[in-house]
């Protein structure tokens, strides 16, 4: 997605999925007559990216030089590429003959049209599932780790050889799923059409090392003008990443949400107390039907989700952002 492109906010307000917790059930939108379509989502491997930049793999190896460290790094890149290619072949072969199929690279997700009957298979690390989640509306997602053990496996928790079984049980509604809560930010009210959605977390702050100045309003009505390094609000999925890192760094006692909890955790980073700014309201929870409201009090603030700074929204003085648990959830096959 090019900077400045935004997802239509109308897509962010779908009826809530059933609260979830790991039990099987019918797949939303599944047609009784139309064969399911399996959409394989993947990203360009590091080797493919290097070849794209250097021309050939041999040229990349030549430019890296003869050193042992360089050779080990390239061997590791080559090994991961081979594992990914193998996993994609296994997943493709697992799709039943009568089913439809599609494939999309991560960089093309914003131009790909998912259908209600789709079963999405993401072949890659956890971050790939976070990337695809914001484009889905209840379609089940199977996370395949092409190189088991190389990542955390929080979302991409299945092996390639499990795909055939998972496709069958997912299509007929027998596969257990988790409805993972997502985070939504709406700018200047629902009617503006401006906002974003993320699986892990949403960040609001300055695009540089300067402080961000804003008015923070909590769900209970308390307010505080702050100058800080930014505000971070995340889901239970995000509570295993950046949100957890912030909590540990500040030795917070805040109980972070679980992945299926309909609530968010939030932190203010490095709030600066001064005669005109406070540092008392720096962490908390946002439960279902609640929100965290932030009004920009400085120019050139940015808003982005899941670390995707290229998809950031630029905020001007006076613009208001409302952050809350999204109605949409990620239906993760577990």
What residue ranges belong to the model's regions?
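Structural motif
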Residues: 118-119
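Catalytic phosphate-donor-binding core of small-molecule kinases
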Residues: 28-44, 61, 71-74, 78-107, ...
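Short glycine-rich anion-binding loops that position phosphate/pyrophosphate groups of nucleotides
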Residues: 45-46, 125-128, 147, 236-240
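Short, basic, low-complexity termini and linkers enriched in Ser/Thr/Gly/Pro
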Residues: 3, 7-13
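Redox-cofactor binding/interface segments in oxidoreductases and associated redox assembly factors
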Residues: 122-123, 233
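Short Gly/Thr/Asp-enriched flexible loops that form oxyanion-binding sites at enzyme active sites
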Residues: 128-137, 243-248
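Short, acidic/small-residue loops that bind anionic groups at enzyme active sites
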Residues: 135-157
